Amino acid sequence: MIPKIIHQLWVGPKKPPHDLMKTWRDNHPDWEYMFWNEESIKEHFPNGLYNQKQYDEMPEWNGKCDIARYEILDKFGGFFVDADAVSLRPLDDYLLENDSFSCYENEFLRGQLIACGYFGAQRDCELVRHNIDAIHELSGNTLWEGGVSAWKTVGPVLMSRLVHQY
């Protein structure tokens, strides 16, 4: 069962979109809410993330979020949603009865890619663990040096491949 915890993460120099983030708290008053940033990651992972090396080498902020999101969900479980997403209504409780859930990215822009920016999972979820392990296999920063975007290496492309593989 997926716990009623909403996770949102913001890293980088820009200010978080607090108005958008508030829509999640407003529509889910009975859920625990955890806002994550560089400091809270260090607080909850005092020995660093399992993929700390990949996190530190990732040049894109959204890629850093993807790397951290899997490890946060592995440890706490819950629902991870991008900080720039709007909640229009509460999530349905039946979603929480699964090991994990997500949705597709915009079908017109990215076809059949599974969105990791809207992803719920129970603690110790096998799919989350596969994402963490796949990221750990990325050697150095060779993938990002070639200009390959994070959404192709640690984001939706990786998630989609692993969902279909497992």
Which residues are covered by each model-predicted region?
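Glycosyltransferase-associated regions of secretory-pathway enzymes
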Residues: 1-65, 81-166
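Small-residue hinge/turn detector
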Residues: 66-78
